[in-house]
UniProtKB/Swiss-Prot annotation:
Belongs to the universal ribosomal protein uL14 family. PANTHER family: 50S/60S RIBOSOMAL PROTEIN L14/L23 (PTHR11761), LARGE RIBOSOMAL SUBUNIT PROTEIN UL14M (PTHR11761:SF3). GO terms for cellular component: chloroplast; cytosolic large ribosomal subunit. One of its GO terms (biological process) is translation. It is found in: Plastid, Chloroplast. InterPro entries: Ribosomal_uL14, Ribosomal_uL14_bac-type, Ribosomal_uL14_CS, Ribosomal_uL14_sf. Part of the 50S ribosomal subunit. Binds to 23S rRNA. This is Large ribosomal subunit protein uL14c.
Length: 123
């Protein structure tokens, strides 16, 4: 569960390394916590030098991994090693061209098919 002030890793090659959540947008109105597939507004806390994204930029991101376990549609409980997000634009397309690490199958149902297709492993 991701809430404001939570630090997240970035799971793509957009140039950012760490994000801090500042607002949960989500899909179900006024949510307090973000889960896998929810959209957040975040600020970049650490970035690779000489890349398009810089420190202290406010961006949108979708959660792809959380340390808090969740039950999948088939009843399997999944928990990841870190909290991670992929930076997206206003249309929901990823800004990077690669996605690192595994992502959840539930992203496909939430119309983030581009992120799922870029991921090396889908759980």
């Amino acid at each position: 569960m991701i809430q404001p002030q939570t630090l997240l890793n970035v799971a793509d090659n957009s140039g950012a390394r760490k994000l801090m959540c500042i607002r949960v947008i989500g899909a179900a109105g006024n949510q307090r916590y973000a889960r896998i597939g929810d959209v957040i507004i975040a600020v970049i806390k650490d970035a690779v030098p000489k890349m398009p994204l810089e420190r202290s930029e406010v961006i949108r991101a979708v959660i792809v991994r959380t340390r808090k376990e969740f039950k999948g549609d088939d009843g399997i409980i999944i928990r990841y090693d870190d909290n991670a997000a992929v930076i997206i634009d206003q249309k929901g397309n990823p800004k990077g061209t690669r996605v690192f690490g595994a992502v959840a199958e539930e992203l496909r149902e939430l119309n983030f098919t581009k992120i799922v297709s870029l991921a090396p492993e889908v759980l």
